[in-house]
Amino acid sequence: KILIDCGSGVTQRLNQSKNSSADIDALLLTHLHTDHVIDLYQLIISSWHSDRDSIWKIYGPKGTKKFVDKIFSAWKIERELRISYEKRKSTNALKYKVYELKKNGSIKINDIKIKYFEVDHKPVPYAYGFSFYNNNKKLTISGDTRPCESLMQNALNSDVLLHEVFIEYEMNKTSKLRTKKTLHNVKEY
């Protein structure tokens, strides 16, 4: 199982869908915005509580190793207390290996070939989309992006395209107007 990003509530969503963080083979991060990584540490702790016995494989943009190291540093005392108090059979779930993605490339996780490619999520310097290949099927995930050539090229011939929506800052002005009008219309209905 592969998890893409770990935003707020990811552990709860996994549990609700009858999945366990202990069963995740790899974590792919599209970019390092909080809405995509805020629950990383909770995900890892939850996997340990679910008796995960393998080291985390985390793939992400440049800066991911430093980011994960800092999170683990911030929670070091709390983690050491848990380890000494809870006495679980393994601490492998609390270990990780980070693979920082280059500009464009591919990796293989189990039987799935994954092609990663840069997308345009300015001002973020490193943001990625992913195409997954398995059993002659192709799934492409855009990550946060504006329209860009790399996504259009990599999404070609996909069986499924999962595309995130990025709202331009300027759109907030019109969305507030539409929201106000919509709320007014709902009251009248």
Regions picked out by a protein language model, each given a short descriptive name:
Residues 1-140:
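Binuclear metal-dependent hydrolase catalytic cores
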Residues 129, 136-138, 146-189:
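Cap/insert and terminal regions of metallo-dependent hydrolase folds
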